[in-house]
Amino acid sequence: MFKLFSTKYMRSAPVVAAAWITMTAGIIIEFNRFFPDLLFHPMS
């Protein structure tokens, strides 16, 4: 019963959206930490 509930809950839209936003923010933060000026570098 709990396994069915937890699997169903973990695949719901708010949980998936929160995980997606957290992973995207982490990738951007780490990229900005290793390459500080590339996110705002002018393309010229």
UniProtKB/Swiss-Prot annotation:
Disulfide-bond pairs as recorded: none
Principal location: membrane
Keywords for the protein's UniProt record, in alphabetical order: Membrane, Photosynthesis, Photosystem I, Thylakoid, Transmembrane, Transmembrane helix
A Pfam short name: PSI_PsaJ
GO cellular-component term (any): photosystem I
Membrane-related topology note: Single-pass membrane protein
Gene3D superfamilies, sorted: Single helix bin
UniProt subcellular location: Cellular thylakoid membrane
Record-annotated membrane-spanning stretches: 9-29
Gene Ontology process terms (BP): photosynthesis
UniProt record similarity statement: Belongs to the PsaJ family.
HAMAP family in UniProt: PSI_PsaJ
Function: May help in the organization of the PsaE and PsaF subunits.
PANTHER family in the record: PHOTOSYSTEM I REACTION CENTER SUBUNIT IX, PTHR36082
Name of the protein: Photosystem I reaction center subunit IX
Organism this protein belongs to: Prochlorococcus marinus (strain MIT 9312)
